[in-house]
C-alpha cells in the first residue's frame, strides 16, 4: 500500500542523508510505478549482492527509540501497539523537536482522495458487500471488526490521560483527545484515525531485531511487492540485547551472566570465602570499561577496513539477491501471501496471485444440510475420517518425496495436506472449522486433497459405504492396515461422480459482482477499495473457471 506522495521523496532522501545513510541514488530512481504509487527503478545494470540501502539502526523509527520509549516500557506496552502510539505522539506532540518527524510526516494515513486507509474489517457495511462470500469472508472471517485494534485504542486513550495527569504530557490532538461533550461521535472518528494509523504502519513495518521489534525504515518501504520473483533481501542482525539494542556484550548481559553464575554458585559446595564469591558494582563497571575499550578498538579496525562505514551489526541493509537490468523496477517481497493477507495487512492486491485460493466450506455445508443421505458420512468425516486421511496422506507424500529426492526433502515438505494436519492438531479433531477450512481450490484450479476426499466420500453408493467406511465395515478404523487399504480410495481424482458433484457445487457458488452500476451504488467504497475488491474477486472467478475446465 503506497501512502507516500511523489512530493515527499526529496524529504525522505534528505532525512537519510542527514542520518549518514547510504542510498545508491546514482543507480536507483524513485518514481511512479505502473503498479500504482511509487516504486524504485534501476538507472543502470546492478549486480547481485550489491547493497542499495544501508542505514544505521539509530535512523529507523521504532517504539524503543521514540520520544516516549520509557513511558511505553514502564507501561509494559510493546509490539505494534507501542509503535502506533509512538508514531502518534512523535507526529503531534513532539513534531517540532523530533529527529524522525521529517521522515514520519511523509507517511500518510489518507489516500490521495483524502479518505482514511482502513482495512476491510472496518469498511462500512455496504462496502463489505464487495467481498462477501469470498475467501476473505468465509475462510478467514476478515470482515469482522478486529477487537484487538479497538482494545488498543482504549489503552492508548487511557495512557494519554494518565501521562497527562502524572507528567503534564500533552494529549495528542486529533487522535487521543476524545471529547466528553460529543463522546460517541468523536470517539468513533478518533477510533477510525487510530485504525488507519495501525493499518498504515502495519503495511510499512520491518522486523528489525529483539530491541526495536517492528520499525519504520525510510526508503525501504518504497519498494513494491512481487509475488514470486523479488529482487531484494532485508538484512538485519536480530540477536541483540532486548533492553538496549547492543549487538555485543553490554551491562544487561553482564548482569544476566552474573545472576546465572550466582545461581550456579548457590548449588555448588560452599568451599570458598565470601570475598571470592561476591561481585559488586565497581567490578561490573570495571568489566564494562574493559568491554568499551575492546569494542572501540574493534570499531576502529572496521572503519579502517571499510572506509568509514559503520559497524554492519548496527545497520540494516537492502541487498540484491539477483542481477537487475537498467530500467527494471526493483521488487521486495512481504512473503508468500495470498491476496486475502495482502489486503488485510498491507492494503493492496496482486492480479493472478499464485497463492490465492477459493474456499468451498460454506458451499459444501449447503448441500450437506439439504441431503439427509450425507449425514452419516459427514459425521464420520468430521469426527474420524478427516484426521485419519490427513495423517495418511501426509505420510504417503513424505514417502514419495523420499523415494524421488532422498531424505533431504522429507524435512521440508510443502504439500498443502501437511498444513491440514498441523491445523488439525492445533484446533482439535472435533473442530468443525478444522475440516471445513481445508475444502478449497488452489490458484491452478486443483481441488485440495480434502476436497477430493470428501467428494469421493459423499458419492459412495450405499453398498460402497457399508463395505468401506461404515461402523460395520471398520470396527477398528484407526488400525493402520485398514487405513492403507481403505483411505487410498478417497484420494482418487478420476471419479466421474465426484467430478460432477464438484462441478455443480462450483456453478452454484455465489461471488460478488463488481461491475458498472453494481459498484457505483456502494457510496462508501473508495477507488482503492473497489480496485482491490475487483482484483480479489476476479482472481477467485478465474480459479473457479480453471477448476471447471479440469473437471470437464
Swiss-Prot record:
PROSITE patterns membership: SET
Keywords (A to Z) from UniProt: Methyltransferase, Nucleus, S-adenosyl-L-methionine, Transferase
Subcellular localization(s) per the UniProt record: Nucleus
GO CC entries: cytosol; nucleus
Record's compositionally biased regions (Acidic residues): 413-432
S-S bonds: none
Region (Disordered): 399-432
Domain of life of the organism encoding this protein: Eukaryota
GO molecular function: protein-lysine N-methyltransferase activity
Annotated SET domain residues: 26-335
Family, as annotated: Belongs to the class V-like SAM-binding methyltransferase superfamily.
Note: Present with 7880 molecules/cell in log phase SD medium.
Protein's name according to its UniProt entry: Ribosomal lysine N-methyltransferase 3
Species for this entry: Saccharomyces cerevisiae (strain ATCC 204508 / S288c)
